[in-house]
A protein has these predicted regions:
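C-terminal helical "lid" subdomain and adjoining coupling/linker elements of P-loop NTPases
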Residues: 1-11, 15-34, 129-137
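Soluble catalytic regions of large protease machineries
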Residues: 33-37, 43-203
Length: 203
């Protein structure tokens, strides 16, 4: 091949972002279907909620460390993050696990990274960004402050206040989980159609 076309650029971009394809990996049909529902859950919630980054690609082709990927691309550079969009991003993160619960009635470990990211984001909203009405605009934790054993973070609040922080983080996560679940419960036909397409075409 003597020329480079857009397909080559797209493949290169996918490899950088998602890792190389693992075409030799043998995946059971049941697991492929579970992955398809997981990724469809992310994509449907992302498409329906307002103000989210557009879904660029959804794939169940194993790449890098993942069995599947839902890839959103912003339409413009972002220098600030806003509360409404961050809340929607939490719902998108939950979409994968909820789709597993609704459509295959099983839970996999594939959502662990989603939960970790969601928990960190919700906690930052409460403790760093002043986005909790219950706790106000005070910064409650400084994760960058060096402790006696190095950069271990610092908890500068009482146990009672920490409990309030934890309760507020839980409230935010629970509310956005409910948002995502309602979306998927009301769009089952779209989910089934998307899974069929992913099973047929992989991307």
């Amino acid at each position: 091949k003597n020329t480079v076309d857009m397909h080559d650029f797209e493949d290169a971009k996918d490899k950088i972002y998602m890792g190389p394809e693992r075409k030799s990996m043998v995946i059971r049909e049941e697991e492929r279907r579970a992955t398809a529902y997981h990724e469809a859950g992310h994509a449907i919630v992302a498409e329906i909620l307002p103000g989210t980054d557009p879904v660029h690609k959804v794939t169940i082709m194993p790449r890098g460390w993942a069995l599947g990927v839902t890839w959103q691309l912003p339409e413009q550079d972002q220098t600030s993050h806003y509360k409404d969009k961050m809340l929607n991003e939490l719902s998108i993160l939950f979409g994968g696990r909820i789709a597993e619960e609704i459509f295959i009635n099983r839970m996999s470990t594939g959502a662990s990274n989603d939960f970790e990211r969601a928990t960190k984001m919700a906690r930052a909203m409460v403790t760093k960004y002043g986005m909790s009405d219950a706790l106000g605009v005070m910064v409650y934790e400084d994760e960058n402050q060096s402790g006696f054993f190095g950069n271990v973070g610092s908890r500068t609040i009482s146990e009672a206040t920490q409990q309030k922080v934890d309760e507020e983080v839980r409230r935010i996560l629970d509310e956005q989980y409910t948002v995502a679940r309602n979306i998927l419960e009301n769009n089952k036909d779209i989910a089934h159609a998307m899974v069929k397409a992913l099973m047929d075409w992989e991307t």
